[in-house]
Amino acid sequence: MQLTPPEVEK
């Protein structure tokens, strides 16, 4: 599962 910048905000 790759985390993109927007998802890293979680």
From Swiss-Prot:
GO terms for biological process: urea catabolic process. GO terms for cellular component: cytoplasm. One of its GO terms (molecular function) is urease activity. Coiled coil: none annotated. It is found in: Cytoplasm. Its main location: cytoplasm. Keywords: Cytoplasm, Hydrolase. It comes from the Bacteria. It is an enzyme of class 3 (hydrolase). Belongs to the urease gamma subunit family. This is Urease subunit gamma. The gene is ureA.
